[in-house]
């Protein structure tokens, strides 16, 4: 295994964003998928505006594209596992029908991700009992994912109860590695902890999905000082694609290859498409990948 086992995708949030549906609302599915082909990527993740499987599969087949996965907002602590299991089963059924590989889960109980409050200082924290509930619930959801031929990959995320490296450690320690895997996101790790290698190096054996998200240092520091919310921060440009920010992806990529990572690396950068043209930034990312990561000379 190695470089040839890595699939390169790009997420739809550069074109349209589920956190703010009004952003990029004029960008159609056909436009998005065609841009992805032009930029040289092999697939994408499912956005909130994507259609039912038969319609989506036709559009994918026309462009020889694949689906990597789709986000699922879990509320295991808030609503209990039985309700979540029912919703997650429907989620996995959809993913199976579109040929996905992973089910991306983020626990949204107490999340400030969608609220207009300081995402840098007001993140939630779980009690010991809540941690136990979450970990047991994720094991249950992971078993369901497996029944549909999917890996459950948990997404550590700004503004949630599983954001920091320490919290990722606790989640990994408390869940069964047979059922719960990790989505490793460079941008969320960096903005949370100022470090994106610790999680990667410590939990490489649990990683089944990867997001390459870059960050703009100056904007990050300004947003932190001004106490911006998650949505305010990405509208101001805190995130960008690899090659346009301050993260060194060469070290990350070499680590993944050295450990025989096999699966998707998905470029992800929440930006306002009216400010950051999605195709232009997809091409910036592709150029960086080809010249800095895949070039045999490097």
From Swiss-Prot:
Q: Which SUPFAM superfamilies does this chain map to?
A: Xylose isomerase-like
Q: Which UniProt keywords apply?
A: Cobalt, Lyase, Manganese
User: Needs which cofactor?
Assistant: glutathione; Co(2+); Mn(2+)
Superkingdom assignment: Bacteria
**What's the catalysed reaction?**
scyllo-inosose = 3D-3,5/4-trihydroxycyclohexane-1,2-dione + H2O
- Keyword Lyase attributed: yes
The biological process GO terms on file are: inositol catabolic process
- List the Gene Ontology MF annotations in alphabetical order: manganese ion binding; myo-inosose-2 dehydratase activity
The similarity comment for this entry is: Belongs to the IolE/MocC family.
**PANTHER family, sorted:** HYDROXYPYRUVATE ISOMERASE (PTHR12110), INOSOSE DEHYDRATASE (PTHR12110:SF41)
HAMAP family (alphabetical): IolE (MF_01672)
List the NCBIfam families hit by this protein, alphabetically.
myo_inos_iolE
Q: What is this protein called?
A: Inosose dehydratase
Which organism does this sequence originate in?
Bacillus velezensis (strain DSM 23117 / BGSC 10A6 / LMG 26770 / FZB42)
């Amino acid at each position: 295994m190695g470089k040839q086992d890595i699939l390169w995708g790009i997420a739809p949030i550069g074109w349209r964003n589920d956190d703010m549906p009004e952003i990029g609302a004029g960008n159609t599915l056909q436009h998005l998928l065609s841009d992805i082909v032009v930029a040289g990527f092999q697939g994408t993740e499912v956005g909130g505006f994507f259609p039912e499987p038969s319609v989506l599969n036709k559009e994918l087949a026309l462009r020889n594209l694949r689906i990597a996965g789709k986000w699922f907002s879990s509320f295991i602590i808030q609503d209990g596992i039985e309700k979540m299991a029912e919703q997650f089963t429907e989620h996995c059924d959809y993913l199976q029908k579109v040929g996905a590989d992973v089910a991306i889960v983020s626990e949204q109980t107490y999340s400030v991700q969608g609220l207009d409050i300081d995402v840098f200082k007001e993140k939630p924290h779980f009690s010991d009992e809540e941690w136990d509930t979450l970990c047991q619930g994720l094991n249950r959801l992971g078993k369901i994912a497996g029944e549909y031929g999917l890996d459950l990959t948990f997404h550590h995320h700004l503004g949630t109860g599983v954001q920091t490296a320490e919290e990722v450690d606790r989640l990994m320690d408390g869940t069964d590695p047979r059922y719960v895997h990790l989505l490793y996101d460079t941008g969320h790790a960096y903005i949370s902890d100022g470090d994106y290698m610790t999680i990667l190096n410590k939990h490489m054996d649990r990683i089944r999905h990867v997001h390459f998200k870059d960050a703009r240092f100056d904007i990050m520091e300004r947003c932190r000082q001004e106490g911006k919310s998650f949505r305010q921060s990405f509208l101001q440009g805190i995130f960008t694609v690899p090659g346009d920010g301050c993260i060194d992806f060469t070290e990350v990529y070499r680590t993944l290859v050295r450990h025989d990572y096999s699966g998707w690396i998905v470029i992800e950068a929440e930006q306002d498409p009216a400010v950051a043209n999605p195709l232009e930034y997809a091409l910036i990312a592709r150029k960086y990948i080809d010249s800095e990561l895949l070039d045999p000379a490097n």
